[in-house]
Amino acid sequence: MRIGLYPGTFDPLTLGHLDIIQRAMALVDRLVIGVAINRDKGPLFSLEERVRMVETECRAIAANGGEIVVHPFENLLIDCARDVGASVIVRGLRAVADFEYEFQMVGMNRALDAGIETVFLMADARRQAIASKLVKEIARLGGDVSSFVTPDVGAALVAKYR
């Protein structure tokens, strides 16, 4: 069984994330979505809210075949990959700036465990501009985020900024 790990903070989960999840499902038998506990980022949503958000929004994708497991983690990404039995880490790329950071991460992860590959999926052209940080800023300022997140995630953002 080929297991992939798609890590992120998902604060909030965006349509860009969901696109990568859907496409990654074609590459693996089980996709573990690693919801990172990253205290440095100061998340808007609690870990529990983000896990629930990912679980809820991924039900429809999982219903089309394949297995999705949501797994919170706080340790090194490579340790999380080992913990869940992943042979591949899936990362989404939006722009050249993403690649520079991800390139460094691949080098470090390969040094820690050369047996775990990293696969990059380019963001769909319609989703390249979506970034969780920008979505939060738009929502905070009362803008319409419906082009960037699902209706449930949009409602959760509105509720957070009331």
Swiss-Prot record:
Site (Transition state stabilizer): residue numbering on this chain: 17
Cofactor: Mg(2+)
EC class name: transferase
EC annotation from Swiss-Prot or TrEMBL: 2.7.7.3
InterPro entries documented for this protein: Cyt_trans-like (IPR004821), PPAT (IPR001980), Rossmann-like_a/b/a_fold (IPR014729)
Catalytic activity: (R)-4'-phosphopantetheine + ATP + H(+) = 3'-dephospho-CoA + diphosphate
GO biological process: coenzyme A biosynthetic process
Keywords for this protein: ATP-binding, Coenzyme A biosynthesis, Cytoplasm, Magnesium, Nucleotide-binding, Nucleotidyltransferase, Transferase
Protein's pathway: Cofactor biosynthesis; coenzyme A biosynthesis; CoA from (R)-pantothenate: step 4/5
Major site of localization recorded for this protein: cytoplasm
Residues binding substrate: 9, 41, 77, 91
One example GO MF annotation: ATP binding
The keyword Coiled coil is assigned to this record: no
Transmembrane regions listed in the UniProt entry: none
Positions of ATP binding: 9-10, 17, 92-94, 102, 127-133
Matching HAMAP family: PPAT_bact
Protein family per UniProt: Belongs to the bacterial CoaD family.
Function summary: Reversibly transfers an adenylyl group from ATP to 4'-phosphopantetheine, yielding dephospho-CoA (dPCoA) and pyrophosphate.
Oligomeric form and interacting partners: Homohexamer.
Protein name stated in the entry: Phosphopantetheine adenylyltransferase
Organism: Cereibacter sphaeroides (strain ATCC 17023 / DSM 158 / JCM 6121 / CCUG 31486 / LMG 2827 / NBRC 12203 / NCIMB 8253 / ATH 2.4.1.) (Rhodobacter sphaeroides)
Upper taxonomic lineage: Bacteria, Pseudomonadati, Pseudomonadota, Alphaproteobacteria, Rhodobacterales
